[in-house]
């Protein structure tokens, strides 16, 4: 195994373990109120899209299967936190968007969650390290697949 391959795999494993450790801590935090963390994830994704989002677009943000996402949307809709709306771009599709109650729940939980994220991340990282981590992770999420597969760096 080449040095580049070894360090890439070590970096991936460390990143994966760090994300899993932090995710467990954040999920266990007493900040969610009446929402499950994945329900909050949907509300958070919708908070940035007042015109609504297609359900298929939400799947990338929440990382659920299509049937799981459909059940989650139905639960949130039955609780009055989201509503369906016509998609002006495709009459066969619909969008989901926050209701006033959903926006309120998102803001309340989001404030507590954001504070807890900050506490968790700043416990061991300086501001400069957080900026560097953010920038590195942005690079990982914006790298075209083709260049990664071709081995370009």
For each predicted feature, which ranges?
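N-terminal leader segment of winged-helix/HTH proteins
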Residues: 1-33, 79, 139, 153
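Charged, amphipathic alpha-helical coiled-coil/dimerization segments
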Residues: 74-132
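C-terminal regulatory/oligomerization modules of transcriptional regulators
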Residues: 1-6, 127-153
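Residues within helix-turn-helix
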Residues: 55-56, 67, 74, 94
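Alpha-helical linker/hinge and terminal dimerization helices associated
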Residues: 18, 22-26, 62, 105-124, ...
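Alpha-helical hairpin
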Residues: 4-7, 35, 98, 124-125
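Pre-recognition alpha-helix immediately N-terminal to the DNA-recognition helix
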Residues: 10, 14, 21, 41-45, ...
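N-terminal helix-turn-helix DNA-binding core of bacterial DNA-binding proteins
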Residues: 24-65, 151-153
